[in-house]
């Protein structure tokens, strides 16, 4: 379909970076909205889903009326269910998008970049830091009074970087939470702060 796929020569740095916030609010981001799954709308849906797991949202328990009751009642969230993949599928697609921007810009010396390149690269690092921060908070097992999982204590999620090969991605175990912070989140935020220090958002008004 020529309206759904961009050719390589149509993809620019601008379209790559602008595609990230657009994808965060995409209806049908997992492909289930067309099958009647009303919870399939990217980051806003993830926010509602996680909020439904707290005590601040009243859950009716009938998924025929409340599309987020599955998160509130902790049902059908395993690996065999589409709802369980809402966060995983979306976040790693967004991480890939950020990695694609980072891969396109030579980040070895920020001083050689023009203002546009600095802003695009800064956005990509900031987005990627946010995505990994969210994933770590979602998937890190915390000690509690109800379940035990000593085998995954201290583990977060797999780290995928621009240089990660397909073969490496297929055998990419969960990284330690500390490593995700030290190798990705904190460095990405430091780079974003440096790259965006001179950035001023345009005034639409």
Predicted regions and their residues:
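Membrane-proximal, proline-rich intrinsically disordered regions
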Residues: 1-47
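Short, surface-exposed recognition loops and adjoining beta-strand edges that mediate ligand/DNA contacts
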Residues: 4-7, 11, 40, 139-153, ...
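Acidic helix-start/capping segments at beta-turn-to-alpha-helix junctions
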Residues: 41-47, 120, 127, 151
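N-terminal capping/interface segment
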Residues: 44-69
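Conserved, well-structured interaction surfaces
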Residues: 61-140, 175-179, 191-203
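Short coil/linker segments at helix-helix boundaries
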Residues: 138-183
């Amino acid at each position: 379909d020529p309206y759904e796929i961009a050719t390589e020569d149509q993809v620019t740095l601008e379209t790559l970076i602008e595609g990230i916030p657009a994808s965060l609010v995409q209806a049908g981001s997992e492909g289930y909205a067309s099958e009647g799954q009303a919870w399939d709308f990217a980051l806003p849906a993830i926010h509602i889903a996680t909020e439904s797991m707290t005590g601040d949202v009243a859950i009716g328990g009938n998924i025929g009326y409340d599309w987020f009751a599955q998160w509130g009642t902790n049902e059908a969230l395993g690996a065999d269910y589409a709802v369980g993949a809402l966060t995983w599928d979306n976040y790693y697609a967004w991480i890939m998008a950020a990695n694609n921007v980072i891969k396109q810009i030579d980040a070895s010396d920020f001083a050689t970049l023009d203002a546009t390149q600095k802003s695009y690269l800064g956005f990509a690092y900031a987005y990627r830091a946010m995505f990994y921060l969210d994933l770590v908070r979602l998937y890190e097992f915390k000690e509690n009074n109800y379940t035990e999982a000593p085998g995954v204590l201290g583990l977060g999620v797999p780290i995928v970087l621009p240089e990660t090969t397909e073969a490496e991605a297929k055998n990419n175990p969960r990284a330690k939470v500390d490593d995700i912070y030290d190798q990705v989140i904190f460095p990405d935020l430091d780079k974003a702060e440096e790259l965006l220090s001179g950035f001023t958002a345009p005034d639409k008004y």
